[in-house]
Design a protein with these regions (language model features):
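Bacterial Sec-dependent N-terminal signal peptides
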Residues: 1-24
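Short helix/turn-capping signatures at newly exposed starts of structured segments
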Residues: 17-122, 126-131, 140-141, 161-184
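Short aromatic loop motif centered on NTY/YTY
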Residues: 129-151
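Short, solvent-exposed loop/beta-turn-alpha elements that line the ligand-binding surface or hinge
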Residues: 154-157
Length: 184
């Protein structure tokens, strides 16, 4: 009887240890312990060992959240979080800018990846041309990446009306910013 009880407790312990969520994993609906249903007020508990800075411009009546920035213990920025609704602590999250390269997708993409890595591992759904960057979207993962136009050939840098194809983007072009967006 003791052996059976010991076996059951051992199984329970092993299962409970394997259910811990990777704090740096990016999925379509989560990043670490933050999910698309996480409320702004929950960030204090989730990042209790880190520092949280939220900037409110204006006064408490007209103020708006600019962003909520999460810093690690060393003062390095990890994430910038934009709520769906300003000044509403029960709001969920609209957008997360992923700063720290320790955050990675299941396919190994992080904020230090190159365009080749993105193109090899994801189906690119859209490329938008803006004034200073191109925006590479991967709708299947709720991700988009910005790449500085300085990474592009000179004939593509100065006209934001040009249609840019993925074949025109150098493989070694580095990601400028990595975003996880939850529209719904």
């Amino acid at each position: 009887m003791k052996k059976i009880l010991l076996f059951i407790l051992s199984c329970f312990f092993i299962i409970s240890c394997t259910n811990k969520k990777d704090p740096f994993l990016i999925t379509k609906n989560s990043i670490g312990q933050v999910s698309d249903t996480t409320m702004i007020k929950d960030l204090i508990q989730i990042f209790k060992n880190d520092s949280i800075r939220n900037d409110i411009s204006g006064d408490s009546f007209t103020g708006k959240f600019n962003d909520i920035t999460i810093f690690d213990k060393s003062g390095n920025a990890l994430l910038e979080i934009t709520p769906k609704e300003d000044l509403e602590y029960t709001s969920t999250i609209k957008l997360i800018r992923i700063i720290d390269p320790r955050y990675k997708t299941l396919k190994g993409i992080n904020s230090s990846s190159s365009f080749k890595e993105i193109n090899d591992k994801y189906n690119i759904s859209n490329i938008q041309n803006s004034l200073r960057n191109i925006i590479v979207s991967v709708n299947s993962a709720n991700l988009y990446f910005t790449i500085d136009k300085k990474e592009l050939p000179s004939n593509l840098r100065y006209n934001s009306n040009l249609k840019i194809d993925k074949a025109q983007i150098p493989e070694n072009a580095k990601i400028n910013n990595l975003y996880l967006e939850w529209i719904n």
